[in-house]
């Protein structure tokens, strides 16, 4: 690899005794240990460095501009040389002697003298962007806050630096304007900065060495292949784990002080001994960038029978980051992201709250700009998806943001926040029935004023935790009784969560959970949980949270899942980072709590994706099982649910043979692999569960040796010896498995297809109406999906008899296909605007939003055509590199190819020509929805009159059956030096060569008529689809080059 080659060359140069290209000729001694630490990492090497220096530089004065009104010349380095330089603390008397003791020589009399202190700076090349980001994060945490990524092109470069430099002009070499005492004063300041620079370097070195030591320990516990792979910097997932281990700033105190490993460890929660499984939420539909927000607010929302997450507002989003006011729906099961089509949306904002009251959703306050703090109230009426502003009476509600809100019964309770007057400390109660505010003033027992805290409801109580009081982060914990309107500071057992703000808090059953927030520390990788019945804190580890920034995120409970959306942070040094949505399975919490606080303390717990409970707990003491004999049993949540046995893959063959032999494998469900791809999940019977948890089942200490001998056995060898039921259970026990609920419960029973359901329903209808059963032959066997509309082919239901039962027929067909709206395709009108004749059968409105190739297309399907058959061509156009290109689309339509050019190919500018008013309406909407309107110029009318001339790098001609009417227009649109034409056409498969020859000949002749001497060639022919019998939709890429 090029990186490894460059690193080897750089390290060889460092080790060489020959002087390098720097003025000094070698590495500064104070920085040598830090460079060694950086260069020892497989993903980094240093290219230049300076440990920090005190210097006086003599440089020529800037040249005078002869003509002030003339053109400015390019700025050039002024040159010069050092009068004094030291990489150690400067000697003030030696510098005074240099400046005042010698009156002659040492440079020209007109040279300007500048006293400087420059802190450490190191240039580091990184293997990839992930390593660079991790290194910058570590450097910023160590105090080098000006560090950043300087290049991501051919080489990934990072500059490590800070801002404690100083620069003071002293005058000219023969005319100093300062005194010797002032020089001594400057040296004292510079030396203090030098000392601070040295401490930061030492802290950064300690951090790197501690992390590299941690990485080495991690590697020692891994297999040799991984050790070798990490040593050579292989670009796999495990290497990214090593990056995280090496550079995540876990040993940095909230005050920025570097701690040793021993000092940092006590800050961790001492009883973090359990783990919960997590999974990234794979987003489909709308671009995931729409969820890249912080300061948004979210809640659970039921749509039909499915639970969704509604998010509103926040800062970020696609393109240039800004405050947003779109309403998004996330399906936590499928990951489908859709934008809720609403009317009357609130203004863009962040730092607001969103609260569910009955069927309504209330948005309170927020901030729409640095000085625009809001106190407006909006309600989303779910019946018609309309946002309405609420005019409240009663007490005055101060504008605020970063407050917290929760609902009990029909009232919304708002506490704290930031306003123009400072922090808020009163409790504001809005009665949604009377639309009236009631403000309760604080007393001595109330929580102090704060912002960025959390508030949740539990029965008739509200719980408040953390926040920031303007001076420090808080970790006090209060409850508010909504019946007595009194606050109470809660007394709890166990270690309380660390102080934090901008965190998440949630209620799951009888547990209150807290995670994330600022300051970011190692405890950010765990959830603090309070059992609300026993008032006991305990902690559950979520290792994957180390890769997230759960700061100003939103947490929503959906069934047994905790879904975290949004969140992130911005740093001057390495820009903005947003968190991807994740889902955490909470269904084992009850079991974890019982295990953690079991009075007999006889169980053993391991880290993993679930809590690992010693299956042998309660056995006779003389059993002394091996430490490795552990199986997870979630007795609290299993109930009557179907069960699975989770085992590591290496035990899968042996376990499957045993389960099948004794009839414990449930054959009605599928064996499947876990999400982490490490385990296999076997569906098992309740009989197996009863046997495996039998209190009298014993495993002898030496059984593990027998077990290892059995692993390679085949089924025939294993059971040829007539293995007993007792021995089979003991072997499975030694596999260290987990008995879990089968959440998916995938059934092997064949379900009915939509065609079968449709046939059954329609058959009953025909019998009821006395119509012939032969009509069933006209039922569709395929259909198309556009947004939420199922589109039937025009060839189905052709007999006029269907019209007599249409009112009963179409709802049945829609039901069989699971469609909200149903339509039937008609012929595309063969006119200049190619209008759609799609017939809407179920539903009142033809407007839809269709997602394809990561792009959002909105259109009225009854007026505009949409061809899914062109998907591959749209994908091909999106894969082009058009970053510096101007594109002209002569037949833009709703943006079929305009949007791929803009969204995916990153075209510099696209001119979109269209004359269909319905398509124009959709096109204008689509460039806005996809956030590319600033790079698209829409030209309404006949392209032969409106298209630009002489500016295009490429032209798209997407009209079928032929675009020949605008070939002349396309040639005139290209630049004089030529460009690319993408010409569409419907061509008989036997005439393809003739058509291509005609295209080249025609374009050549057109160019000549316009005085253009071009070499016209066919670069590529794309066969998109069959348009009809022997008729192909072709796209030819025609390259025009000036000769």
From Swiss-Prot:
Q: Name one GO molecular function term.
A: tRNA 4-demethylwyosine alpha-amino-alpha-carboxypropyltransferase activity
- PROSITE patterns, per the entry: SAM_MT_TRM5_TYW2
> Which residues are noted in the entry as S-adenosyl-L-methionine-binding?
874, 942-943
- Which residue spans traverse the membrane? none
Q: Where is this region: Disordered?
A: 53-75
Into which EC class is this enzyme placed? transferase
Q: Which GO terms describe its cellular component?
A: cytoplasm
Query: Which keywords belong to this entry?
Result: Kelch repeat, Methyltransferase, Multifunctional enzyme, Repeat, S-adenosyl-L-methionine, Transferase, tRNA processing
EC no.?
2.1.1.282, 2.5.1.114
The record lists the catalysed reaction(s) as: 4-demethyl-7-[(3S)-3-amino-3-carboxypropyl]wyosine(37) in tRNA(Phe) + S-adenosyl-L-methionine = 7-[(3S)-3-amino-3-carboxypropyl]wyosine(37) in tRNA(Phe) + S-adenosyl-L-homocysteine + H(+); 4-demethylwyosine(37) in tRNA(Phe) + S-adenosyl-L-methionine = 4-demethyl-7-[(3S)-3-amino-3-carboxypropyl]wyosine(37) in tRNA(Phe) + S-methyl-5'-thioadenosine + H(+)
Q: Which residue ranges are recorded for the region named tRNA wybutosine-synthesizing protein 2 homolog?
A: 700-1041
Give the metabolic or biological pathway.
tRNA modification; wybutosine-tRNA(Phe) biosynthesis
What domain of life is recorded for the organism?
A: Eukaryota
Write out the ranges of the annotated region (tRNA wybutosine-synthesizing protein 3 homolog).
1-233
A GO BP entry is:
tRNA methylation
Q: Which family does it belong to?
A: In the C-terminal section; belongs to the class I-like SAM-binding methyltransferase superfamily. TRM5/TYW2 family.
Free-text function comment from the UniProt entry:
S-adenosyl-L-methionine-dependent transferase that acts as a component of the wybutosine biosynthesis pathway. Wybutosine is a hyper modified guanosine with a tricyclic base found at the 3'-position adjacent to the anticodon of eukaryotic phenylalanine tRNA.
UniProt source species: Oryza sativa subsp. japonica (Rice)
What the entry lists under PANTHER family is as follows:
TRNA METHYLTRANSFERASE, TRNA WYBUTOSINE-SYNTHESIZING PROTEIN 2 HOMOLOG
The Kelch repeat ranges on this chain: 360-410, 412-460, 461-510, 512-559
* Keyword Transferase tagged: yes
Q: What is this protein called?
A: tRNA wybutosine-synthesizing protein 2/3/4
């Amino acid at each position: 690899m090029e990186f490894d080659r460059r690193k080897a060359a750089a390290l060889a140069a460092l080790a060489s005794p020959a002087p390098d290209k720097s003025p000094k000729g070698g590495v500064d001694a104070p920085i040598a240990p830090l460079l060694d630490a950086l260069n020892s990492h497989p993903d980094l090497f240093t290219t230049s460095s300076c440990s920090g220096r005190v210097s006086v530089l003599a440089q020529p004065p800037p040249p005078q501009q002869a003509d002030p009104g003339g053109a400015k010349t390019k700025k050039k380095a002024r040159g010069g040389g050092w009068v004094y330089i030291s990489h150690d603390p400067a000697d003030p008397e030696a510098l005074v002697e240099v400046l005042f003791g010698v009156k002659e020589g040492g440079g020209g009399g007109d040279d300007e003298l500048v006293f400087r202190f420059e802190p450490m700076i190191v240039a580091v090349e990184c293997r990839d962007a992930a390593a660079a980001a991790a290194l910058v994060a570590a450097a910023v945490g160590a105090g080098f806050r000006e560090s950043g990524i300087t290049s991501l092109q051919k080489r990934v470069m990072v500059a490590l630096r800070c801002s404690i430099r100083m620069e003071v002009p002293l005058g000219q070499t023969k005319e100093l304007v300062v005194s010797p005492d002032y020089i001594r004063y400057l040296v004292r300041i510079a030396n203090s900065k030098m000392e601070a620079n040295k401490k930061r370097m030492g802290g950064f070195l300690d951090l790197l060495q501690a992390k590299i030591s941690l990485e080495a320990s991690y590697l020692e516990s891994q297999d040799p292949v991984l050790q070798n792979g990490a040593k050579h910097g292989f670009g796999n997932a495990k290497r990214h784990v090593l990056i995280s281990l090496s550079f995540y700033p876990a040993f940095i105190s909230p005050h920025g002080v570097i701690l040793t490993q021993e000092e940092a460890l006590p800050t961790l929660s001492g009883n973090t001994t359990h783990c919960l499984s997590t999974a990234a939420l794979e987003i489909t539909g709308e671009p995931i960038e729409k969820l890249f927000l912080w300061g948004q607010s979210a809640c659970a929302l039921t749509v039909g029978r499915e639970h969704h997450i509604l998010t509103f507002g926040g800062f970020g989003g696609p393109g240039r980051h800004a405050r947003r006011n779109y309403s998004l729906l996330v399906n936590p099961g499928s990951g489908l992201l859709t934008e809720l089509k609403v009317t009357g949306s609130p203004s863009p904002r962040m730092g607001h709250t969103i609260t569910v009251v009955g069927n309504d959703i209330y948005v309170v306050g927020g901030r729409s700009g640095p000085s625009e703090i809001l106190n407006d109230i909006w309600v989303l009426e779910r019946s018609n998806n309309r946002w309405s502003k609420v005019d409240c009476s009663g007490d005055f509600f101060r504008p605020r943001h970063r407050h917290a809100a929760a609902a009990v019964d029909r009232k919304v309770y708002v506490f704290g926040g930031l306003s123009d007057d400072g922090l808020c400390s009163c409790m504001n109660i809005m009665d949604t029935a009377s639309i009236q505010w009631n403000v309760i003033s604080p007393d001595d027992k109330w929580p102090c004023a704060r912002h960025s805290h959390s508030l949740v409801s539990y029965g008739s109580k509200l719980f408040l935790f953390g926040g920031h009081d303007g001076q420090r982060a808080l970790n006090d914990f209060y409850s508010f009784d909504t019946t007595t309107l009194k606050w109470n500071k809660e007394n709890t057992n166990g270690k309380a969560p660390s102080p934090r703000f901008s965190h998440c808090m949630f209620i799951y059953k009888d547990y209150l959970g807290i995670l994330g927030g600022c300051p970011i520390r190692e405890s950010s990788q765990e959830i603090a949980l309070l059992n609300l019945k026993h008032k006991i804190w305990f902690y559950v580890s979520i290792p994957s949270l180390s890769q997230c920034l759960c700061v100003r995120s939103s947490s929503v409970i959906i069934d047994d899942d905790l879904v975290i959306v949004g969140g992130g942070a911005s740093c001057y040094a390495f820009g903005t980072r947003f968190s991807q949505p994740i889902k955490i399975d909470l269904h084992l919490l009850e079991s974890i709590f019982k295990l953690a606080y079991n009075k007999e303390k006889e169980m053993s717990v391991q880290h993993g994706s679930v809590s690992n409970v010693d299956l042998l707990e309660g056995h006779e003491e003389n059993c002394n099982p091996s430490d490795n004999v552990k199986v997870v049993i979630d007795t609290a949540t299993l109930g009557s649910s179907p069960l699975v046995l989770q085992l590591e893959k290496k035990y899968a063959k042996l376990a499957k043979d045993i389960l099948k032999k004794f009839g414990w494998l449930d054959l009605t469900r599928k064996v499947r692999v876990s999400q982490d791809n490490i385990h296999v999940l076997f569906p098992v019977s309740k009989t197996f569960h009863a046997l495996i948890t039998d209190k009298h089942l014993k495993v002898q200490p030496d059984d593990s040796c027998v077990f290892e001998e059995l692993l390679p056995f085949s089924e025939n060898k294993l059971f040829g010896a007539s293995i007993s039921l007792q021995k089979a259970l003991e072997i499975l026990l030694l596999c260290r498995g987990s008995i879990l609920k089968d959440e998916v419960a995938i059934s092997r029973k064949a379900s009915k297809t939509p065609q079968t359901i449709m046939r059954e329903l329609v058959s009953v209808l025909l019998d009821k109406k006395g119509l012939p059963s032969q009509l069933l032959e006209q039922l569709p066997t395929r259909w198309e999906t556009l947004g939420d509309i199922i589109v039937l082919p025009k060839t189905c239901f052709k007999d006029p008899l269907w019209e007599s039962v249409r009112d009963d027929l179409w709802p049945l067909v829609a039901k069989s296909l699971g469609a909200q709206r149903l339509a039937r395709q008609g012929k595309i009108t063969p006119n200049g605007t190619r209008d759609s004749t799609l017939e809407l059968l179920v539903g009142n409105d033809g407007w839809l939003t269709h997602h394809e190739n990561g792009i959002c297309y909105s259109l009225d399907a009854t007026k505009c055509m949409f061809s899914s058959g062109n998907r591959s061509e749209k994908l091909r156009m999106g894969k082009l590199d058009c970053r510096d290109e101007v594109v002209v689309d002569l037949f833009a339509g709703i943006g079929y190819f305009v949007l791929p050019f803009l969204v995916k190919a990153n075209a510099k500018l696209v001119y979109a020509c269209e004359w269909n008013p319905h398509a124009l309406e959709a096109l204008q909407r689509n460039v806005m929805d996809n956030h590319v309107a600033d790079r698209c110029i829409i030209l309404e009318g006949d392209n032969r009159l409106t298209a630009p001339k002489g500016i295009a790098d490429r032209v798209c001609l997407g009209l079928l059956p032929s675009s020949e009417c605008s070939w002349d227009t396309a040639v005139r649109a290209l630049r004089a030096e030529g460009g690319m034409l993408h010409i569409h056409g419907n061509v008989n498969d036997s005439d393809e060569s003739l058509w291509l020859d005609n295209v080249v000949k025609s374009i050549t002749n057109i160019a000549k008529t316009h005085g253009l001497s071009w070499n016209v060639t066919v670069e590529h022919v794309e066969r998109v689809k069959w348009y009809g019998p022997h008729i192909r939709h072709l796209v030819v890429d025609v390259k025009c080059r000036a000769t």
